């Protein structure tokens, strides 16, 4: 291989091309084309070189019929085979019959010449090169000129599917051809490397004609409309006009006037009416009086009845403005209710409302519930959120008198009856007391109790059942020591009156413990027949009267289902 490389470097008449594939379908077969450019005797056409290469391909196919090897391995085998071949066979393989005398002389020292540069400073060598004649210079120049043309044009015509880069000479083996290809490339012009920044009046467009044409044009066809001019009337007169406008509106809606010291808010509608009236205050006020589309203040537009209904609806339904509008404030829309709610929250009326609601919740509500939202939304005692089985919240001490008839009928279905342990003892066997266990202790019960009433202190006697016309109400007041919960509308015969829960059947006081209670609903009296109770009560001895008015059981107003 060293001999071949020295031959390629020193022979002026040979130009080698890179190994390339002769057939696109068989990329594994590589060959090398050499074109002689020295003299007419040693010139070969490219067709003859291709015929030699086809012969080499057939030899390779016959010698290696086995499995195909990779391209790199075939290239290495070809290089190693060509390096081991003698010089004469290598020249015959590439189509050379005779060699130049200069190449034969320099091939003897190929081992040392491979590591030396092409140029030398030896005077003898320079003289021999000069004496060798002008033939060498002509051959070198012709090789440099014709190598790119042969490899680029003829090979590209024969193999159009192959890229032109496969037929160019290697830069390491042929510095002459690489330098010629570099010389063919034109350098970049100077204006492409350094661009000029176009700044200045000479690079600007002339828009004078465009601006002159647009001076008379309008942005839109509609004319501008004046909404307010602050320079015509002084500020004091404007404030007086606004105050009079608000005063007239208050007089029409609620019949009252604004205080003198209160600041007047701006009203865009009133000011716009003043502009339309050419700043005539009297005419603007006259138009505002009869204009139904004037934007009114939210708090001023609502009457006192509407405010009370809204507050009651807010206490019952919370922030469900649809229910408030449907049930409480039907004269307003849902949007107006929402607007009034946010205006109402900023007023002193809302502060007073929240204070009263929180006070009522602390006094009568369950302990530990102090949330402001729950106070405002669920603090109504008559609201739908209160369970039916829970007792009604007592009224203040000032409301001890009998309420209206519809309140008594409404509470009759929700408030359970309660009895003390003394009544259950009086209904027991003779000589022993019948103890009714509390609701938390297991055991048999005389009557299945309902939910036990709350243990909150009561300031008045709970309302009794509705008495019929023939039943006289109880007139005797209970003893001072008796619990108000023991007084019920169920009375017994005179022989067996009720005894206070704080005294035993023998008259001795009991321990100060919370008396057990039995809650009886009206429907449960239907389980007991009057004929079964009267003989049972007649067998018991009489007890001293306790001061309570009593009637026979047959006269009791019992509702059966």
UniProtKB/Swiss-Prot annotation:
Residues 297-349 form the SANT domain. Residues 195-292 form the ELM2 domain. Residues 140-165 have a biased composition (Polar residues). GO terms for molecular function: histone deacetylase binding; transcription corepressor activity. The modification Phosphoserine is found at residue 11. Residues 1-28, 52-188, 360-515 are annotated as: Disordered. Keywords: Nucleus, Phosphoprotein, Repressor, Transcription, Transcription regulation. It is found in: Nucleus. Residues 439-451 have a biased composition (Pro residues). SUPFAM superfamilies: Homeodomain-like. One of its GO terms (cellular component) is nucleoplasm. The keyword Repressor applies. Pfam families: ELM2, Myb_DNA-binding. Residues 417-428, 453-482 have a biased composition (Low complexity). Part of a complex containing at least CDYL, MIER1, MIER2, HDAC1 and HDAC2. This is Mesoderm induction early response protein 2.
């Amino acid at each position: 291989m060293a001999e071949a490389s020295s031959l390629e470097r020193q022979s002026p008449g040979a130009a080698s091309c890179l190994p390339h594939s002769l057939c696109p379908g068989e990329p594994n077969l590589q060959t090398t084309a050499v074109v002689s450019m020295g003299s007419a005797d040693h010139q070969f056409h490219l067709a003859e070189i291709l015929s030699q290469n086809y012969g080499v391909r057939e030899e390779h196919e016959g010698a290696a019929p086995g499995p195909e090897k990779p391209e790199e391995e075939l290239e290495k085998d070809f290089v190693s085979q060509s390096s081991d071949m003698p010089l004469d066979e290598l020249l015959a393989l590439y189509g050379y019959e005779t060699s130049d005398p200069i190449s034969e002389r320099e091939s003897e020292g190929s081992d040392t010449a491979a590591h030396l540069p092409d140029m030398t400073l030896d005077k003898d060598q320079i003289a021999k090169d000069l004496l060798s004649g002008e033939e060498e210079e002509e051959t070198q120049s012709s090789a440099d000129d014709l190598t790119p043309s042969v490899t680029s044009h003829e090979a590209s015509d024969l193999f159009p599917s192959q890229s032109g880069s496969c037929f160019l000479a290697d830069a390491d083996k042929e510095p002459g051809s690489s330098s010629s290809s570099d010389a063919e490339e034109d350098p970049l012009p100077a204006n492409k490397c350094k661009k000029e920044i176009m700044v200045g009046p000479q690079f600007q467009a002339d828009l004078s004609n465009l601006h002159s044409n647009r001076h008379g044009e309008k942005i839109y066809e509609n004319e501008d409309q004046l909404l307010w001019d602050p320079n015509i009337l002084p500020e004091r007169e404007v404030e007086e006009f606004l105050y009079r406008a608000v005063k007239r509106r208050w007089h029409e809606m609620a019949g009252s006037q604004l205080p003198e010291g209160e600041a007047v808010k701006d009203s865009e509608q009133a000011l716009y009416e003043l502009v339309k009236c050419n700043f005539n205050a009297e005419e603007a006020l006259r138009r505002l009086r009869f204009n139904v589309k004037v934007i009114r203040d939210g708090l001023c537009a609502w009457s006192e009845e509407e405010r009370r209904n809204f507050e009651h609806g807010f206490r019952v339904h919370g922030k469900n403005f649809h229910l408030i509008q449907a049930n409480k404030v039907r004269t307003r829309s849902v949007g107006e209710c929402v607007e009034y709610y946010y205006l109402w929250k900023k007023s002193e009326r809302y502060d007073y409302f929240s204070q009263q609601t929180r006070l009522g919740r602390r006094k009568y509500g369950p302990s530990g519930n102090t949330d402001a939202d729950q106070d405002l939304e669920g603090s109504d005692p008559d609201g739908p959120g209160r369970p039916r089985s829970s007792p009604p919240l007592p009224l203040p001490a000032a409301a001890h008198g009998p309420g209206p008839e519809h309140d008594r009928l409404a509470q009759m279905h929700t408030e359970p009856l309660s009895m003390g342990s003394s009544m259950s003892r009086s209904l027991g066997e003779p000589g022993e007391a019948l103890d009714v266990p509390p609701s938390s202790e297991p055991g048999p019960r005389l009557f299945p109790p309902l939910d036990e009433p709350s243990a909150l202190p009561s300031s008045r006697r709970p309302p009794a059942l509705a008495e019929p016309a023939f039943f006289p109400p109880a007139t005797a007041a209970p003893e001072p020591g008796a619990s108000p919960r023991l007084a019920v509308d169920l009375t017994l015969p005179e022989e067996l009156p009720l005894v206070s829960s704080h005294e035993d059947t023998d008259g001795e006081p009991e321990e100060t413990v919370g008396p057990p209670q039995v809650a009886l609903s009206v429907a449960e009296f239907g389980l007991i027949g009057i004929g079964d109770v009267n003989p049972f009560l007649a067998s018991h001895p009489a007890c001293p009267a306790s001061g309570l008015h009593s009637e026979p059981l047959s006269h009791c107003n019992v509702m059966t289902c």
